[in-house]
């Protein structure tokens, strides 16, 4: 969210002395007067003034997590769990009600990285907790990526894991959910993933962007 207007209504206090903020060499703005507007248990909101090279002034408001361990590579992980079961390839999905969206949301399993964990360790743990599936094989880990960089610095790594769906421990997966979580687990054949996502009733369920991008990538690979 940003406003580059110079009117007094854009959030910039014209009477406040500009306290400059250190910026990277490739930042095209002068930043000043950074402040925490609200600080909660899980997140905080901040705003910072900015000035363009033409002298236009605005304010940028953003949201930041309070939970990221200092040593963590990202805030969290999203997990692409490929389940091979009875000769077929499935993707593990989760469905849960998201209060900010006001709807059910179809997603990849995901979660925050705990202190002392790597992204891969967090992925294995979160997969077990959210879905009950057990995996000991990490196929790949992505580089750091940001989820909505115009609004937040919330970040993740994508971790791809393989799951033996025929193994005894994966015959009847048991979730290990927090007391406030309500998550439904689905197995969808990878070859039918895009069709499954496309045919959802969008009036009652939405699709998380990382999952949609993955489904579109699978579809485009066959074109």
From Swiss-Prot:
Coiled coil: none annotated. Mg(2+) binds at residues 126, 130. One of its GO terms (biological process) is nucleoside phosphate metabolic process. PROSITE patterns: NUDIX, NUDIX_BOX. Its cofactor is Mg(2+); Mn(2+). GO terms for molecular function: ADP-ribose diphosphatase activity; metal ion binding. One of its GO terms (cellular component) is nucleus. Keywords: Hydrolase, Magnesium, Manganese, Metal-binding. Residues 72-213 form the Nudix hydrolase domain. Signal peptide: none annotated. This is Putative nudix hydrolase 2. The gene is ndx-2. InterPro entries: Nudix_hydrolase (IPR020476), NUDIX_hydrolase-like_dom_sf (IPR015797), NUDIX_hydrolase_CS (IPR020084), NUDIX_hydrolase_dom (IPR000086). Belongs to the Nudix hydrolase family.
